Structures are given as structure tokens and as C-alpha cells.
UniProtKB/Swiss-Prot annotation:
Name of the gene: queF
Biological processes per GO annotation: queuosine biosynthetic process; tRNA modification
InterPro entries reported in the protein's UniProt record: GTP-CH-I_C/QueF, NADPH_dep_7-cyano-7-deazaG_red, QueF, QueF_N, QueF_type2
Catalytic activity reported: 7-aminomethyl-7-carbaguanine + 2 NADP(+) = 7-cyano-7-deazaguanine + 2 NADPH + 3 H(+)
Pathway linked to the protein: tRNA modification; tRNA-queuosine biosynthesis
Cell compartment(s), UniProt: Cytoplasm
Coiled coil: none
Protein's UniProt name: NADPH-dependent 7-cyano-7-deazaguanine reductase
Naturally occurring in which organism (per UniProt): Buchnera aphidicola subsp. Schizaphis graminum (strain Sg)
Active site per the UniProt annotation: C170 (thioimide intermediate), D177 (proton donor)
EC number(s) given by UniProt: 1.7.1.13
Keyword field: Cytoplasm, NADP, Oxidoreductase, Queuosine biosynthesis
PANTHER family: NADPH-DEPENDENT 7-CYANO-7-DEAZAGUANINE REDUCTASE
Binding residues annotated for substrate, in chain numbering: I69, E70, S71, H209, E210
């Protein structure tokens, strides 16, 4: 390894606890499990002979870690390896694992994929009902959890819903964060129009990806009170990175392949 740089100092940790307290989650007894899944498309370093190497990385950060990582700082951190030599890929992964584990104060997994290994991955879509094509009027783009409603019939159903219309904003740069949101639940029927209005109400809301998804989970859980609930977001790529957090109180396994906008 060459170019001795303290790459770790580029990383900016953001405490999960502050936001969780803000939305009145019990930090010692979270109502969900989950992970934040990062895909890195612009990852490069040098081998021991100085030949540039490239890979796509998939990183999974456990929901019980103390911190998330501010994405701009993460991009700067990743780019700091572009001119560094490593004897092999294992050495590179070990550096990433040690630095990121220290930053988040929690569990992390990192896998590198060659282009050949993923070239046959297909673009997929969420399964279930897309709620985007409703003939409804939208009048508010300010975060409004009270939009959420259940239907009048008192029948327990199991339903998978999704939207591609979600937008929130980065609290650091105020740039838009675009996402597709998947919601699977078992419980009293959630009114589709109310759910879409609620999700669109994030359009002027400033919050990190992970925080938005925990807020959505918490709002639906508290207002609609489903027996089971899973919320999964796949955000579009920015700076060569997409972030895909999920939260669930049941046995949920998210698919990890790209959506059309990723």
C-alpha cells in the first residue's frame, strides 16, 4: 500500500439517536430491524504494480449501528483511494471494513463484484400495486402524517404497495433525493389515496435517506397500526452511490437488483 493518507478523517458520522428521539422511537427497543444497503459504482484503486482496478461494491450497514454516514463525505472517502496501491483486494476490503466499522460503531459487510460478475443483472420492479396512477388532487407538499388513513371496512388484508414518485431533500446540500418506496403490510386496509398524498408530502422535507424511511415506518405503524409492516426504499444514484434502506418488523428479505432509474 502506498500514499499513506488518513482516509478515515474524510468520513462524517451522523448519529441515529438524535433523529430517533425526534420521532419518539425507543432507541433501546426499536420497533423494526433492517439494513442500509449502499451500492458503489465508482470505486477504483491501484494494484501492487500500479494498474488501476475497478469494482462495484455492495455495503450493508446494520440498523443497530450508532451512526449513519453522510454520503458526500463517503464519496470523498472512496475517491481518496484512487491513487493508493494495495497488494490484493482483501487488503483493500479490510481497510474499508475497519474504517467504516469505526465510523458507524456497528456491524457492516462489504462485497466487491467485478463487472463480469454482475453484467447479467436485470433491471426489475417492485411487485404489488403501484399507487401512482390515481386520479387525485395534490395540494400540499409539506410533510403531513395526518394524511394517512385506513379504509372504513374493518377487514384484515395483506397488501404490497409501491410508488416511484417519492422525493425528499438532502439536509446538507438541499439537493433532491429521488426514490421508489415499497410498503408491505398486514392489517386494516390503508387508503391508497391517503398513502400517496402522505408520501408526496415529503417533497419539501429535508432528511437523510435512512431517516425518511424510519419516519415513514413509524408514521404508518403508529397511525394505521398494521400487524406486520415492511418499508423499503431504493434511491436513485448520486455521485456514483445509491442508498437503499429497509425497515421491517417481520421476516422481510429485500431484493437487491436495480430499478429502472438506478
Amino acid at each position: 500500500m502506498s500514499l499513506k493518507i488518513n482516509n478515515f478523517n474524510f468520513l462524517r458520522p451522523i448519529s441515529r439517536k438524535k433523529h430517533r428521539k425526534k420521532i419518539k422511537l425507543n432507541c433501546l427497543n426499536l420497533p423494526f430491524k433492517g439494513k442500509d444497503i449502499w451500492t458503489l459504482y465508482e470505486l477504483s484503486w491501484l494494484n501492487k504494480n500500479g494498474l488501476p482496478q475497478i469494482a462495484i461494491a455492495k455495503i450493508e450497514i446494520d440498523v443497530n449501528s450508532a451512526n449513519i454516514i453522510e454520503s458526500k463525505s463517503f464519496k470523498i472517502y472512496i475517491n481518496s483511494f484512487n491513487q493508493m496501491k494495495f497488494n490484493n483486494n482483501i487488503d483493500f476490503i479490510n481497510i474499508l471494513t475497519n474504517d467504516l466499522t469505526k465510523c458507524i460503531c456497528g456491524q457492516i459487510s462489504i462485497k466487491l463484484f467485478s463487472l463480469d460478475a454482475i453484467k447479467n443483472e436485470t433491471i426489475t420492479d417492485f411487485h404489488g400495486i403501484c399507487i401512482d396512477n390515481q386520479n387525485i388532487k395534490i395540494e400540499s407538499y409539506k410533510y403531513t402524517p395526518s394524511f394517512l388513513m385506513i379504509n372504513s371496512e374493518r377487514k384484515i388484508i395483506k397488501e404490497d404497495l409501491y410508488t416511484h414518485l417519492f422525493k425528499s431533500n438532502c439536509p446538507v446540500t438541499q439537493q433532491p433525493d429521488w426514490a421508489s418506496i415499497y410498503i408491505a403490510y398486514t392489517g386494516l386496509s390503508i387508503n391508497h389515496a391517503s398513502l400517496l398524498r402522505y408520501l408526496i408530502s415529503f417533497r419539501s422535507h429535508n432528511e437523510f435517506h435512512e431517516e425518511c424511511i424510519e419516519r415513514i415506518f413509524n408514521d404508518i405503524n403508529n397511525i394505521c397500526k398494521p400487524e406486520e409492516l415492511s418499508v423499503y426504499a431504493r434511491y436513485t444514484r448520486r455521485g456514483g452511490i445509491d442508498i437503499n434502506p429497509w425497515r421491517s418488523n417481520t421476516n422481510f428479505s429485500p431484493f437487491l437488483t436495480r430499478l429502472a432509474r438506478q
